[in-house]
């Protein structure tokens, strides 16, 4: 026996039923759909229609809204930054900005800038220029000897 002579056992693969191909097939004429009515027509299902019962999408309450003023920050964790520094993709000498993070492959798209979060540990002293940072991230960066400059944030005195 050769590989090109292999074949299935008889009846191992059942052919699919081709409906509407003559009455002798047992599934001809109406094709197993019965006679007349909504369900016998093509494009039968009406999405969400439950036979007159109040459909689920109308039974459940409306919820929430999309805030058009919400800021869409790209999130970067300190652990990832430390890994990039150790891999040689980030230098600690110059300030770390959005462009530097994008070049290092840590950020893809950032509509409203980058937000720094404290997951992981940072041992290198780095200066960050970012749009936002969590209090824990600022504390961790300053503990490592670095600094966080929040760009675009109004100083407290100017906010009055």
UniProtKB/Swiss-Prot annotation:
Keywords, in A-Z order: Ribonucleoprotein, Ribosomal protein, RNA-binding, rRNA-binding
GO MF entry, a single one: rRNA binding
Residue ranges with Gly residues bias: 21-35
Annotated spans, Disordered: 1-52
Domain of life: Bacteria
Start-end of Basic and acidic residues biased regions: 1-18
GO BP: translation
InterPro entries per the UniProt record, alphabetical: Ribosomal_uL15, Ribosomal_uL15/eL18, Ribosomal_uL15/eL18_sf, Ribosomal_uL15_bac-type, Ribosomal_uL15_CS
GO CC terms of this entry: cytosolic large ribosomal subunit
Family label: Belongs to the universal ribosomal protein uL15 family.
Role summary: Binds to the 23S rRNA.
HAMAP family for this protein: Ribosomal_uL15 (MF_01341)
PANTHER family named in the record: 50S RIBOSOMAL PROTEIN L15, LARGE RIBOSOMAL SUBUNIT PROTEIN UL15M
Quaternary structure and interacting proteins, as annotated: Part of the 50S ribosomal subunit.
Protein name stated in the entry: Large ribosomal subunit protein uL15
Organism the protein comes from: Rhodospirillum centenum (strain ATCC 51521 / SW)
Lineage of origin: Bacteria, Pseudomonadati, Pseudomonadota, Alphaproteobacteria, Rhodospirillales
